[in-house]
Structure formats: structure tokens, C-alpha cells
Swiss-Prot record:
Pathway(s) this gene product operates in, as recorded in its UniProt entry: Cofactor biosynthesis; iron-sulfur cluster biosynthesis
A UniProt-annotated Pfam family: SufE
Superkingdom to which the source organism belongs: Bacteria
Keyword Translocase: no
HAMAP family linked to this entry: SufE (MF_01832)
Gene Ontology terms: biological process: iron-sulfur cluster assembly; sulfur compound metabolic process
UniProt-listed PANTHER family: CYSTEINE DESULFURATION PROTEIN SUFE (PTHR43597:SF3), SULFUR ACCEPTOR PROTEIN CSDE (PTHR43597)
Role this protein plays: Participates in cysteine desulfuration mediated by SufS. Cysteine desulfuration mobilizes sulfur from L-cysteine to yield L-alanine and constitutes an essential step in sulfur metabolism for biosynthesis of a variety of sulfur-containing biomolecules. Functions as a sulfur acceptor for SufS, by mediating the direct transfer of the sulfur atom from the S-sulfanylcysteine of SufS, an intermediate product of cysteine desulfuration process.
Entry similarity comment: Belongs to the SufE family.
Keywords recorded for this protein, A-Z: Cytoplasm
Gene3D superfamilies: 3.90.1010.10
Keyword NADP: no
Protein name listed in UniProt: Cysteine desulfuration protein SufE
Amino acid sequence: MAALPDKDKLLRNFSRCANWEEKYLYIIELGQRLAPLSPEEHSVQNIIQGCQSQVWIVMDQDPTGVIALRGDSDAAIVKGLIAVVFILYDRMTAQDITEFDVRPWFEKMALTQHLTPSRSQGLEAMIRAIRAKAANIS
């Protein structure tokens, strides 16, 4: 399984896509790079409310306080959006996550303007859920 790119490489790769079809394919590819969740992790406690698709997000904290995010979805594009969000929050502490605004990154990628309203709402639900989980840890 290939590693996810960092924030800057994500932005570079995204800008190299010739059109939105290529960008969607890249997002789907990122989702395919996510490590699978175990059947036990596909539980009610990890499900994200407010997403049209099924979305599960697991948050762990290492001894140094850095958060590790893992997730899954039953929809390929949504799984890719999960990967994008995880890239933006990569190597952050719980406090960093609660303070970091991902929306400017979405604007740089012109992401939200090319998503359906239900996917945009689901993306916001994911961000709110991750920030809420991080706030409970910090």
C-alpha cells in the first residue's frame, strides 16, 4: 500500500491534473491507499453522522501526543475525501487538529466548489467529527 503524500505534494499533484475527471480519479486513488479498518472498527462508535455514505473514522494517539487517523467509506470518492482530510491533519496533536482550519486548503484545491452539496455536507461532517474527537482527547 503506497503512502499518502504530504500537504504540499497533495496540492502539487492536484494542480497537475488536467481536468476535474482526473482530479476525481486522483482522489479515488488516494482513498485506495488507506489502510483497511478491521471489522470491529466498522462500528457504531466510529461512524460519522451527517454523511450520505457510510463513513467510519478511528482516532488513536501515540505516546508523544500525535494523532493517527484511520478511516473507511462504502463510496470510493468519499473514501478519497477521507484520505485528503487525513493528509491535511497528518502528524498533528489533538490541539493542533482543533486549531487547524482545513478550509483554505480546500479552497486552494477548488475542492468544495466541485463537490455535490451532499458530499460537501459530508466533508464538513467529517471535519466536525474529527475536531470533536480531538477536542475530547486534548
